[in-house]
């Protein structure tokens, strides 16, 4: 059995954890970029903070 291998809380090896972290961070950054673009487009369409004249 693999008794000599250090076991982490997640059960992943160091390499597996690093690989998962890389994929996770890349996916997260893509998600954040899409969210930022969506917010910019929504703001251009209908701003949600009124100007001095209110929602005119």
UniProtKB/Swiss-Prot annotation:
Segments in the Periplasmic topological domain: 46-56
Identify the residue ranges that face the Cytoplasmic compartment according to the record.
Answer: 1-22
Q: Which UniProt keywords apply?
A: Antenna complex, Bacteriochlorophyll, Cell inner membrane, Cell membrane, Chlorophyll, Chromophore, Light-harvesting polypeptide, Magnesium, Membrane, Metal-binding, Transmembrane, Transmembrane helix
Q: Which family does it belong to?
A: Belongs to the antenna complex beta subunit family.
The domain of life for this entry's organism is Bacteria
Q: How does it assemble?
A: The core complex is formed by different alpha and beta chains, binding bacteriochlorophyll molecules, and arranged most probably in tetrameric structures disposed around the reaction center. The non-pigmented gamma chains may constitute additional components.
What broad class describes the main subcellular location of this protein? membrane
Report what the protein is called. Answer: Light-harvesting protein B-880 beta chain
Any one GO CC term of this protein is: plasma membrane
NCBIfam families cross-referenced by the UniProt entry: pufB_517_ASD
Q: What does this protein do?
A: Antenna complexes are light-harvesting systems, which transfer the excitation energy to the reaction centers.
Q: Which GO biological process categories is it annotated with?
A: photosynthesis, light reaction
**Matches recorded under InterPro entries:** Antenna_a/b (IPR000066), Antenna_beta_CS (IPR023623), Antenna_beta_dom_sf (IPR023624), LHB-1/5 (IPR002362), Light-harvesting_complex (IPR035889)
Q: Which residues cross the membrane?
A: 23-45
> In the UniProt record, does the keyword Iron occur?
no
SUPFAM superfamilies registered for this protein in UniProt = Light-harvesting complex subunits
List the PROSITE patterns.
ANTENNA_COMP_BETA (PS00969)
Mind listing the GO molecular function terms for this protein? bacteriochlorophyll binding; electron transporter, transferring electrons within the cyclic electron transport pathway of photosynthesis activity; metal ion binding
Residue numbers binding a bacteriochlorophyll:
21, 39
| Pfam families for this protein | LHC (PF00556)
Which cellular compartments is it found in? Cell inner membrane
**Record membrane topology:** Single-pass type II membrane protein
